[in-house]
Every structure is written in structure tokens, then in C-alpha cells.
């Protein structure tokens, strides 16, 4: 991408830093990770969790959610102004699972948000450490991406369920900053914009007055984020049209849906980061690892290394398959929900199966589920190889637009050939090329029709042995190309509902 010169790297976004060199970036990301780890250890002490209980992923998620809730300024303010029955705006909590007499017991805990904020700041050298909070949000988002399908949300905004591979980060909160914006898929941004436009259509005052001015600024900012994800001039020009519209309405919604469809072939650039549960960082810090001194990267070997020697447990329901639960969490850890299953399987060294074939529900346990029958097992989060995370859409030719992989948003920078029936996607583009954006639409369709799926994406990029930390000798896998491995096809997973 030619225009990337002014952009900050992810790690800079992640840590709010200005331009830094690699060492400084690794140190500041390390500082962020170390802070999460120290916070987790302190929380385990406060809650008197045993070593085993501290490694339970469900406990980790509760602790992460508590600190995210404690720092959610807007919601805290809202809760104080609209007191609801039985909700103390100053407290936060959740289920903590303890092992008592060979059984798992659920205990609901409640803490002062002020106290949680104090513990978090103390673990982060007295700072608010927003980067660490965003990091945990992205981990939760990646877990949701691997666990739930967003068919209903897609249909509600007038999009097509086949666009599910564009929905990365669709459950990230608005407050997730630049690092959050980087990991949002094209479909997620389109959906946020459509919701906004629909509100404007239904509510005459949405764009008016002082509030309306702020709304407008947010709208244009979101348009620019989405524009930055597209890699062809025609798609970007169309985004300019949407952004500059005086009074956004149905024409803009049409344009956005058109752009989302086009992203199935002309993939947008979406960042991928390996964000791990807080307990993993806690374990490493507790065993004496100094993240800031050693440095850390979210897109290199470091997360793989960490998972190689961390033991994390999970509660398992009576009819769930522990191996499937492990796959779900592994995919979440590497932000691989939208990656080609063949690539994931090769890196993991175990077959990664489509979601419809998993015998496992989500990781979190609902408050009405029976604990009597709960068991726990070790999550197998190790991998055979490691690979660099990408933020390109995997289009084969950056100079002139070409095809990325349909139904897949690549996570790993690993060579793969592109099995791909362009006809099936092109069928979605019959019909409307009228209106203000007709020339751009025609141009985008022309690019897609001429986009040859060249032989391979990420040519020459391979995976690395876990001993090869400097990534010196890539192993380029060869895949059986009879079918494209999308995780979502033939799917019957449950929906994500807030």
C-alpha cells in the first residue's frame, strides 16, 4: 500500500506512541503486556484464587471485564444519571469459579470500581494505561469473532450473511481507539455507518445542532477509517462520496453495501493481532518474565512462544469436546476466525475444523447453567509453527487491483493459492449502476471482473519453526486446493447477542 508512509504501525497505535524504532515499540508493547500481567496477579491475590483457579480462562474473562467496566467512563456516567433497580453504578463484578471438594462452585463477586481502578493503575506505574484496556477489548472481540456468527446483524442492516468474513471486530466497543479501528473489518465499519445513517433518516435532529455537529465529525471519521481499509482508487473515491454527502440517506446505504460486497473480492486491509487472555500474561510475569526489558510484539513470534509454555484451563459442559474448545480459544488468541482453515491447520499442526462441526458452545458460562455437572480441562493452545500476522487483505497484486481470497480475511502472512469462483460473487453485482457513483461502480466491477486470481497470495511467505525467532528460514506450505477452507460455511453456531 503506497499511502502507508504516514500511518503509525499497530504497535504505535496500541501504545499511543509517536514514531518509534522497533526496539522502542517492542519495549512499550512489553510495558503494556507486563501491566496486564501484574494487574492479573494482584487480582488473584485479592480474590484468594489458587494457582489452578487463576489459570481458569473463565476467571480471567471475569477479571478482564471488571476492569473494562471500571474504566467505561460513558457507561458509568449513564448509570449514575439513570439509576436502574438493583444495579449499583459504583460497583462491578461477575462470576468467579472456585474448586471446592472436587467440584466447581460459582461465586458472584462485587467490587468497588474505584478499587479496581486503583489496582489497575498501581500495576501500570500509576497510569491509566488505556492501551492495555484496548488490548483486552480486542481479545474479547477476537473470542466473539471465533464463537458467534453475525448473520442476524448483517441481515438487519441489509447486508448478506455471506459477508460474514468482513465482520472482524463487530463487537468491539466504540471507545476502542486507533488500535480497535485497525482490527475492524470492512463489514463492521459499513454496519456502523449504516446504523448511523438509519438513525439520521428516522430522527430529524440527529445531524442538527451542537450534538449533530459532533455526530457529523464522528461520521466523517468513520468514513475515513473505512476508506483507509480499501486498496483501490475507485473504492476510495466512492468512500469520499459517502463522506461528503450533505444529508446521508438511502443512496449512501446502497453505496456502502455495494462497497462491502466488492470487498469480498478486493479485500480490505484489516489488522490482526494475537491478544491473549490476561491470565497468560499473569503467569509469565509471575514466573519472572520481564516483558518491558525483553520487548514484545503482537504480530510476531512472542504470543506463540507464550502459549507454548502456558497452561490454561477451561470449564467444560457435559457434552462438549475439550479439543474443540481448545480450537476455539486458539483461533481467538491468534485472531484467526476469518483465516483459511488449511493455513490455520498447518500452523497449529492439528486439523482445524469448520465451526459447524465443533461440539462446543462459547467459553463463558451463563448464570443459570448448572455447575454440578461442570468439569474442567486443559486448553491445548500450542502450535507446530509460527507465522507473521498480516494486515493486507491478501490481494495478489498491489500495483493493480487483483483478487484476494473470497470468504477469507487472511490472518497469517503465508503463501496460499486462491481457489475461487468469481462467478458466484460477481452474480451479486448485477443490477444497479445508476446514480452519482455510477462511474465508480462500473470501474469497481471492471476491476473485479479483470482481477485474475493469480496463482498465489503472499508469494514466497512461509511459516517458521518455533526455534527460528528471527524468521530466517521460511517453510512455504503447499495446500490441497480442492476446496477453500472457510470456518463459517455450513454453519449452525449461535448468534452473538449483547
UniProtKB/Swiss-Prot annotation:
Q: What is known about its subunit structure? A: Homomultimerizes to form the nucleocapsid. May bind host exportin-1/XPO1. Binds to viral genomic RNA. Protein-RNA contacts are mediated by a combination of electrostatic interactions between positively charged residues and the phosphate backbone and planar interactions between aromatic side chains and bases.
From which organism does this entry originate?
Answer: Influenza A virus (strain A/Swine/41/1949 H1N1)
Classification from the root reads: Viruses, Riboviria, Orthornavirae, Negarnaviricota, Polyploviricotina
Top-rank taxon of the source lineage equals Viruses
Indicate where this protein resides in the cell. Virion; Host nucleus
* Biological function: Encapsidates the negative strand viral RNA, protecting it from nucleases. The encapsidated genomic RNA is termed the ribonucleoprotein (RNP) and serves as template for transcription and replication. The RNP needs to be localized in the host nucleus to start an infectious cycle, but is too large to diffuse through the nuclear pore complex. NP comprises at least 2 nuclear localization signals that are responsible for the active RNP import into the nucleus through cellular importin alpha/beta pathway.
Locus of motif Unconventional nuclear localization signal: 1-18
Q: What is the recorded post-translational modification?
A: Late in virus-infected cells, may be cleaved from a 56-kDa protein to a 53-kDa protein by a cellular caspase. This cleavage might be a marker for the onset of apoptosis in infected cells or have a specific function in virus host interaction.
Q: Which GO terms describe its molecular function?
A: RNA binding; structural molecule activity
* Major subcellular location class: virion
User: Could you give a single Gene Ontology term from the biological process aspect?
Assistant: viral penetration into host nucleus
Gene that produces this protein: NP
Similarity field: Belongs to the influenza viruses nucleoprotein family.
This protein is called: Nucleoprotein
Q: Motif Bipartite nuclear localization signal located where?
A: 198-216
Q: List the residue ranges of the region (Disordered).
A: 1-23
Alphabetized, the UniProt keywords read:
Capsid protein, Helical capsid protein, Host nucleus, Host-virus interaction, Ribonucleoprotein, RNA-binding, Viral nucleoprotein, Viral penetration into host nucleus, Virion, Virus entry into host cell
User: Where is the chain membrane-spanning?
Assistant: none
UniProt cross-references to InterPro entries, sorted A to Z: Flu_NP
Task: Give the GO cellular component terms, alphabetically.
Answer: helical viral capsid; host cell; host cell nucleus; ribonucleoprotein complex; viral nucleocapsid
One Pfam entry name:
Flu_NP
